[in-house]
Amino acid sequence: MIFAGAQKNLGPSGVTVVIIRKDLAERADKNLPTMLQYRTYIKEKSLYNTPPTFAIYIVGLVMEWIEAEGGITGIEKRNATKAKLLYDTIGASSGYYRCPVGDSSRSKMNVVFRVAGGDEGVEKQFGKEAAAAGLVGTPGHRSVGGMRVSLYNAVTLEAVEALTSFMREFQRTRG
């Protein structure tokens, strides 16, 4: 069974994609409420209740776009290129930017890093100047701090190049 939240990369928030073998759905506990049984949706061809038609329409448009971009293979290659560019920029900064996540555990979608040893004032300035340069949403989660850059499918390589150029210039003028 594959259960995937679709938000940000496949469609709007709230859409979930489920791919399940029929035999797994049939083995599920029959005492579950009807709405919670995958066999119900298989039997009714996903139309047991009113589906979120606009959200499904958007997922369809995104799937067409993904296909036009070379399918999953093309998107994966592009996302790997974007992530490598950003991680390489962090790695080449002589410690000015530091990723707290080990190489083998790093995400290609959400890159977290600290600036100037985690100096909150410098990180706040980084976020402010990045936003002024059109690079919005770089501050990390309020409970963790640091910076967080999301490289979702729709983010272009050119946008990541603009970010890494900004990062090098920010380091040059402040580091």
Predicted features by range, described:
Residues 132, 141-175:
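PLP-dependent enzyme catalytic core of the Aspartate aminotransferase-like
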Residues 97-130:
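Conserved PLP-binding catalytic core of the aspartate aminotransferase-like
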Residues 6-87, 102, 173-175:
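Active-site C-terminal subdomain of aminotransferase-like
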Residues 96-100, 134-140:
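A short linear hydrophobic-aromatic micro-motif
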Residues 20, 113-117, 151-153:
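Short beta-strand-to-loop capping motifs
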Residues 1-3:
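Internal gly/pro-rich beta-alpha loop/helix module
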Residues 89-93, 125-134, 166-173:
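Generic non-transmembrane alpha-helical segments
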Residues 87, 106-110, 144-146:
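Active-site lining segments that contact anionic ligands and/or coordinate catalytic metals
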